[in-house]
Amino acid sequence: EVKAAQRRYLNNMETEMRGFQLDSCFGPSGCPNRAVSSESIVPRIQALLEEADLLAFLKQTVSGKLRFHHELRVTVADCPNACSQPQIKDIGILGACRPALTDAECTRCEACVAVCPEMAVELRDPGPVVDGARCIACGKCVAVCPTQTLGTGQTGYRVQLGGKLGRHP
């Protein structure tokens, strides 16, 4: 019965709370879109959130019953595709891989141009040029380049605060 489950959920809400919600994507289980691996940072973030004792802070500052929407929501995604919805959480941490031009000769196959979801790669002479303003650091162009003309440049994370929708919040 839906109503009974809803009552149990609402009655147990305060005992289920930790002061934060930490989610991550399925990237570590083999997602082909991974720009970086978040396996090592998720436990570290969880430890920091537990150490901060956000639940005690919420109990002191929130008048009335605590609800899940009071908790700090943090999500980690291994790529800008953001299947774990970091854009709509209080803190979103997105994996990023910026391409870098190497000394390897370009064969002009245009695989990098075709795979870029933002049309940030253009083929010029002598090879690909990445528009840094349009690039979302997904690393797809790096992954498909058969000659490694586009190699892995800077990798890391982009942090978004405040929760907004869209690929370009």
Predicted regions and their residues:
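Iron-sulfur cluster-binding cysteine motifs and their immediate structural context
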Residues: 90, 111-128, 140-158
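Small-residue-enriched alpha-helical segments and adjacent helix-cap loops
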Residues: 1-107, 115, 129-136, 165
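Short, intrinsically disordered, charge-balanced linker/junction segments flanking boundaries
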Residues: 156-169
